[in-house]
Regions:
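N-terminal helix-turn-helix DNA-binding module of bacterial transcription factors
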Residues: 1-4
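Ligand-binding beta-strand-loop-alpha-helix segment within the catalytic cores
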Residues: 7-49, 73-156, 160-162, 166-173
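Acidic/glycine-enriched edge-of-secondary-structure segments
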Residues: 23-25, 51-57, 180-184
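Gly/Ser/Thr-rich loops at beta-strand to alpha-helix junctions
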Residues: 53-63, 86-87, 152-153
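Distinct, well-ordered alpha-helical segments
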Residues: 66-70
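Glycine-rich phosphate/nucleotide-binding loop
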Residues: 169-184
Length: 184
């Protein structure tokens, strides 16, 4: 069953530990909550002093933040968005999720107040801002990265890609997206 599949995937992907939560999180809110609960438990168990935790946005990462228990003792950690913001739902923004997790862990958090989709010229100007530069320096030193993998079609729409690009991705067999990269 699932344990055998977990072991196979661990071997194929070269991953030390992999957990499969049965069900379809798109159809069942309880599956998403369980994913959040398991992920937050793993994070808490692996934390060490001075960790820099990067987290992306999305419904799964919001579930991780929601299901994380408030720590009884503060952790000397920094939580930071691993990417800029995307879309308009506050609850699923990486900034919001980083703040919730940072507070629940009794640690610190930083915000990254830039959109996820910026033209190169605009990005070059924005990264000169000291606050943003400090956040980017922290991102470069993340030692725990927590990210979701989204459906390619849904993420292409959220990223407001041109219809031609979306069609091209779908024709190429794209099924998943992470960090703006699409996978078949």
């Amino acid at each position: 069953g699932i344990l055998l599949l977990q072991e196979k995937l661990q071997t194929i992907l070269g991953i030390q530990k992999l957990i499969i939560v049965p069900g379809n999180s798109s159809d069942n809110e309880l599956v998403l909550k369980e994913m959040g609960k398991i992920t937050s438990s793993i994070i808490i168990n692996m934390l060490q002093s001075k960790d820099i935790i990067g987290i992306t946005g999305g419904s799964t990462m919001a579930a991780v933040a929601s299901e994380m228990c408030k720590s009884e003792k503060p952790h000397d950690v920094m939580v930071i968005p691993a990417r800029g913001g995307l879309g308009s739902e506050l609850e699923t923004q990486a900034n919001s999720i980083a703040a919730v997790i940072g507070n629940k862990l009794g640690g610190r958090y930083r915000l990254l107040n830039v959109p996820d989709t910026l033209e190169k010229d605009a990005l070059e100007i924005i990264v000169k801002n000291n606050e943003i530069k400090e956040s980017i320096d922290l991102i470069k030193n993340i030692n725990i990265l927590i990210f979701g993998i989204g459906r390619a079609d849904a993420m292409a729409i959220r990223r407001k890609l041109p219809k031609e690009r979306i069609n091209s991705l779908m024709e190429a067999g794209s099924v998943a997206e992470a960090f703006g990269h699409y996978f078949d």
